[in-house]
Regions:
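Beta-strand-enriched cores of mature, soluble protein domains
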Residues: 1-154
């Protein structure tokens, strides 16, 4: 099997779905990036260098497990796609549940979720694997989502 490892930083926002089912639809984009992590006497730091190239597109639906209005402190499910261009799209769904909660008192939120890769199209047609997401949402509703993926291709 071939293994693909990736780290990406997606930026975007979620909006309520128009159908009234308490589903939020998120859409975000991530550029090509080179990450450098450095451990020093002062601690650890990461730098990101944006590279020329296409952007990946992340589209998902998010719903609280109890199907109530989406809010902090409530476990949720998220499913959707990540498109890497040229018809190469990953499908994913939640492993367990995701959660998020306030950070401080300025309206910022932090959360995390794990997704299972469920195939896709193009290169990812029979892909399996796991993607982790550590995300933040600011008071204005803008999100930043750090992904780490370990994908296996047959």
């Amino acid at each position: 099997m071939r293994r693909i490892l990736y780290n990406m930083v997606f930026r975007g926002r979620g909006e309520s779905a128009p159908d009234g089912e308490n589903i939020s639809i998120t859409k975000s984009f991530a550029p090509c990036v080179r990450f450098t992590t450095e451990i020093t006497a002062d601690g650890v730091d990461m730098r990101m260098e944006e590279l020329d190239g296409p952007k990946a597109e992340f589209v998902s639906k998010v719903q609280n497990i109890d199907r109530s209005e989406f809010a902090a402190g409530k476990p949720f499910r998220e499913w959707g796609t990540i498109s890497f261009g040229n018809g190469n799209v990953l499908n994913f769904d939640t492993v367990g549940t995701g959660e998020f909660s306030p950070v401080g008192d300025d309206g910022q939120m932090q959360g995390g979720i794990v997704w299972c890769v469920e195939g896709g199209t193009g290169l990812f047609e029979k892909a399996t694997g796991i993607i982790t997401s550590n995300f933040g949402i600011d008071a204005a509703g803008d999100g930043i989502d750090y992904h780490t993926g370990v994908i296996y291709l047959p």
